[in-house]
């Protein structure tokens, strides 16, 4: 049964994602943690990088190794990447 808002029906879709939070993780430890997370994760999943450009580079490097894709969670928060599987076609 759809929910209603102002008399208009709408449907809510919630996707539960696994999250890796890299706040407080040293750059030299991050790559191992990201590999371990990606290996075990189901997709889509989130990786919170914070605003560190170096941490974002590390995350993107690992994501490329697995031929995965990522995008920012939203335009306001560029400290969180959503990682998705690469689909050919």
What are these regions (language model features)?
Residues 2-89:
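Long, charged, low-complexity intrinsically disordered regions
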């Amino acid at each position: 049964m759809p929910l209603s808002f102002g008399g208009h029906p709408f449907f809510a879709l919630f996707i539960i994602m696994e999250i890796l939070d890299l706040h407080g993780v040293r750059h030299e430890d991050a790559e191992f943690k990201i590999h371990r997370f990606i290996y075990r994760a189901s997709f889509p999943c989130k990786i919170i990088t914070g605003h560190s450009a170096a941490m974002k580079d590390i995350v993107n490097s690992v994501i490329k190794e697995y031929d995965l894709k990522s995008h920012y969670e939203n335009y306001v928060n560029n400290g969180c990447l959503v990682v998705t599987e690469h689909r050919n076609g």
